[in-house]
Amino acid sequence: MEIYANADASDMNLTRAAAKIEAQGYMRWPRALEIVRFAKAAGFSHLGIAFCVGLAEEARRYRELLEKRFRVSSVCCKVCGIPKSRLGLDQIRPEDPEEVQCAPLCQAEMLNRAGTELNILIGLCVGHDALFTKHSSAPVTALVAKDRVLGHNPAAALYSQYWRKRLLSGDGVP
């Protein structure tokens, strides 16, 4: 309780908005709508979307929905166009010297400069989402967590007998 007694006004605003949306939308609204309602309840007017190029269509559709209510800035993961080979990074296709790295630091910086008040992740890679969150000046929430194997539904691994067994046994886990 003491941590909330010492929370700043911004944190308490987010805490109240989150509780309000949880109470009103519990088991009623999809996450896409919860984010809209949360942003409104928190008093935000400028939202950011950091998205994976592989989910560009989903990001476009969500941006379209958000633009009816907010100012929106969005940034694709490949924004800086830096080849992985220049930084000595592992590549998906080692034969391609121009394979471009994802750039969560650039995404965060661009949305910071745009002055977004809440940033929404759409399918950033594991690790890239952590870097983006670390460097974002605004609070961050996720609409889509990338999972190429399970249709961007990572919780399915916990419900699926097959994947749960593999995860528990360490099969395929280095």
Model-derived features with residue positions:
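A short, acidic, amphipathic alpha-helical segment used as a generic capping/interface helix at domain edges
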Residues: 101-116, 124-128
